[in-house]
Amino acid sequence: MGSDFSTVKIRKVTSCSICKAMMSHPVSINCGHSYCKSCIQSYYCNVSPKTGWKMLGCPLCSSPFSLENLRPNKELETIIDMIKGMEEQDQDMVCEEHEEKFNRFCEDDGQLLCWRCYWEDRHKGHTLAHVKDVYQNYKEKLQNTMTKLRELQENHEVQIHFITHQINAWKDAVEDRRQTIKSNFKNLQSFLQEEEKFYLWRLENEEKEMLVQLEGSEANLQQTFERAQCQIQELEAKCQGSAQKLLQDVKNTLSRCEAMKRNPLKADPLKVHTKCNVSELYFDVKTILRRHQVSVILDPSTAHLDLALTKGGRLVTYKRCPRDLQARSSAKRFYGLPCVLGCEGFTSGRYYFEVSVENATSWDLGVCVENVHRGFNMKKEPESGFWTIKMSEEDGLEALTSTPTPPLHLIEKPQILGVFLDYEAGAVSFYSVTTGSHIFTFPKASFQDTLRPFFQVYQYSPLFLPAINNQ
């Protein structure tokens, strides 16, 4: 009864005294009374021509006003909109069969009932309750479900970010492998070019297949994320509405929300499977290289005093030796770093030699100008007469140049290395005989002096130069 009385009072406040209906676009005049904008304008236009007055009296209190002083009453307009919304909700919450207001709820069927539905046989034996009694319980259920959906949404958002990271990481890994494959083929003979295209084609297909999987996972997660957002908006609307609105079809709503389970992300390892195993392809190239193979013997007159040469000058080992001052004074001998040169000198043509490094963890090898500096401040770079590569446990395999270069990639640690020199072409190249792959070629040089094989030996890392007839 009190609620009905309040509604009457609110309607009276929000009604226009001219048209007697709820105000539309309410405006206030000087005295503070409010009217429909169209009503007060019509009133002014009807009365003013008859009297000739620019100022007219308020229809309620006769206080003077003019159209110039009309002010939109936003607060009243907001109240009117709220009343209309409440009335619309109340209209929706009426039993279509009996045209009575819903005020009961059937727990078994999950349906709203009017007082006439309440007494029907179809609900006999069911758990029936007043709307007010079950409202709070179901509101809490909806809110709990909304919390779970938000957690699901947050989880999927994290997974979307993870998938995006996976895509970028996958692209980087593929690009890294692509560069490795390209470098393997860079300086090989022209007949290998078609094979290079084939391997890159396989890699592209592998990349596309994995990206399709990753992007598909990303799209599925995005769809789930958006569905969760829609469910959250629906639940928010229910929780903000009336009790009847909240309970209407509530079990179906909860069932749909519960059906959205969190799917664990399957994070497969991002491993590029395409490998360029050029062992068979490289067989013909090795045959060509070995046409130019020479048997290298180490020159004892150049060996640092801490190096021991054995097996006919083919094995060199780092070993602390007694100092021979006369031997140390030799201009040919390295006295700074533990290095040694091969006996052979190259002034023209092509040469290829192999070095066994299977028992060594660190080494420097290649070719150098015969008269390079032998002291401590030796810079192993082309500008100083060195064309060498270096292996170390800390930095891996790298080319020794005046400017830093990225580490050289190897499929596996080489047991035997091949060094190829084309004097006229100004080329020095390195190959892994173990895997049959190209490692590195220095930029073209212009050789003028005699070149010789160069080796720097480290502790516990002996180097061996196999004879040609033993390979």
From Swiss-Prot:
Enumerate the InterPro entries for this protein: B30.2/SPRY, B30.2/SPRY_sf, Butyrophylin_SPRY, ConA-like_dom_sf, PRY, SPRY/PRY_TRIM38, SPRY_dom, TRIM/RBCC
Q: What is its EC number?
A: 2.3.2.27, 2.3.2.-
What keyword terms does UniProt attach to this protein?
A: Cytoplasm, Immunity, Innate immunity, Metal-binding, Transferase, Ubl conjugation pathway, Zinc, Zinc-finger
Reactions catalysed according to its record: S-ubiquitinyl-[E2 ubiquitin-conjugating enzyme]-L-cysteine + [acceptor protein]-L-lysine = [E2 ubiquitin-conjugating enzyme]-L-cysteine + N(6)-ubiquitinyl-[acceptor protein]-L-lysine
> What Gene Ontology molecular function terms does this protein carry?
transcription coactivator activity; ubiquitin protein ligase activity; zinc ion binding
> Which pathway does UniProt place it in?
Protein modification; protein ubiquitination; Protein modification; protein sumoylation
Q: Which residues cross the membrane?
A: none
The identity of this protein, by name, is E3 ubiquitin-protein ligase TRIM38
Source organism per entry reads: Mus musculus
